[in-house]
Amino acid sequence: MKKLILVTGGNGRFARVLKEKNKDLNLYFASKKECNILKLSSLEKIIKKIKPQIILHCAGLSRPMNVHEKNISKSIDLNIIGTANLVKIAKKNNLKLIYFSTGYVYAGTKGHYSE
């Protein structure tokens, strides 16, 4: 039986592409309403409901830096606090966590990056 993968940001851009392209994975796309990453109780509820083995974290803001700077508290909440909550839940429930990000973590400068 395939492992169940909880996808946060289930209505976002990346999730839409994943829905279209996926043929082999057992994915559960959770909406913000169903899986609010800012609330540990919401995360506990969805974990208990669907019992995933993996969390694919695609929720968050992925806009140019000038948009983030206009609403820095929302950016911090979603991209830092929400991710920290998922790390806590994954650790508590012994789940694997895969985190997706964008090139905007590099201050929006263009170019090729290496880490």
Residue ranges and their predicted role:
Residues 2-23:
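N-terminal Rossmann NAD(P)H-binding glycine-rich loop of SDR-like oxidoreductase domains
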Residues 4, 84-115:
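Conserved Rossmann-fold NAD(P)-dependent oxidoreductase catalytic core, especially the SDR/UDP-sugar
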Residues 15, 37, 64-66, 107-108:
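Glycine/Thr-rich phosphate-binding loops of Rossmann-like dinucleotide-binding domains
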Residues 16, 20-24, 45-48, 84, ...:
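Short, well-ordered alpha-helices that flank and scaffold nucleotide-derived cofactor binding pockets
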Residues 23-45:
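Adenosine-cofactor binding site in Rossmann-like domains, unifying the SAM/SAH pocket
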Residues 73, 77-84, 92:
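Conserved internal alpha-helix in NAD(P)-dependent oxidoreductase domains
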